[in-house]
């Protein structure tokens, strides 16, 4: 921990917390800091110009990152009949109905995302207290409650990330790994920003994208000049 602390301190000394870095420079700094023994994630925090306390200004959605997330995702699907077969063909690891619900109640949750066909919500709805706190509860706003379960599975496997604004009005998301090429990280960040723009509440006034900062898992935040994103 001492070595990590010293490395973090050395990196922090290189970063001007008040400066807005061009995206290429910001990514170079963040990747330089990502020297842990594991492939650190590259995360983004976006401060939105919304009032998170107002229900009509809750920003939530999902986006498929063009370059993926660098993470292998296991998918569980609530579906029956033909839709169940389609989910399996698309790559879902676990597919079921009441049997899947019983597995979840027993604590057997070896998956990262849950998708549900609308006609199964009578079953899924009973699992809210288990799935909700874990961020696994299917929701139509992020595309995990859908009649097209096959596409939802493919999107999850392809690198879909979900986002939801927190109480402070900030969106947190992962846009890849430290091992990614800068071009891949830029592409993923642009896709996320575009999705956030599309999710802008009609009642949001003033500047919507207020601040954007990048960091690695063990690193410090580097603020990004939004003008450099538009120039990509």
From Swiss-Prot:
Q: Name one Pfam family in it.
A: Ribosomal_L1
Write down the superkingdom of origin. Answer: Bacteria
Quaternary form?
A: Part of the 50S ribosomal subunit.
- List UniProt keywords, sorted A-Z: Repressor, Ribonucleoprotein, Ribosomal protein, RNA-binding, rRNA-binding, Translation regulation, tRNA-binding
Family membership: Belongs to the universal ribosomal protein uL1 family.
Name by which UniProt lists this protein: Large ribosomal subunit protein uL1
- Regions that span the bilayer: none
Q: List, in alphabetical order, the Gene Ontology terms for molecular function in this entry.
A: rRNA binding; structural constituent of ribosome; tRNA binding
Give the matching InterPro entries: Ribosom_uL1_bac-type, Ribosomal_uL1, Ribosomal_uL1-like, Ribosomal_uL1/biogenesis, Ribosomal_uL1_3-a/b-sand, Ribosomal_uL1_CS
What PROSITE patterns does the entry give? RIBOSOMAL_L1 (PS01199)
Q: What does this protein do?
A: Binds directly to 23S rRNA. The L1 stalk is quite mobile in the ribosome, and is involved in E site tRNA release.
Gene Ontology cellular-component terms for this entry are: cytosolic large ribosomal subunit
> In the UniProt record, what gene is named as encoding this protein?
rplA
One GO BP = regulation of translation
